[in-house]
Amino acid sequence: MEYKFEMGQGKLRVVVPKELDHHLATQLKEEADLLIETYHVKTLIFDFTNTEFMDSSGIGVIMGRYRHIFLLGGEVWAIHTSERMRQILNMSGVTKIIQIYEEGMM
């Protein structure tokens, strides 16, 4: 599965693919940055519903988009994270800068 974007009410939702690695990272971040700038996105949501694997380039995508959104006065969320994805996000330090929401918390 490839990634996809969904826009609405100043929010950009990135449905992260099953595997986010260096093969997709560059394309995903370029497209996300373009959408953030074009639509003045204030909330970026990474949806990990389908994600089973993410390497350091995937972490880089999240961190880079966080910096971009933060400079615009916005925020970044992660939703639908599995236990495995929460471990990856915790170990990488991502959870110190973005919010993780579970079903029904948003």
Regions found by a protein language model. Give the residues of each.
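Histidine-anchored nucleotide/phosphate-binding helix
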Residues: 62-66
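STAS-like cytosolic regulatory interaction modules
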Residues: 1-52, 67-106
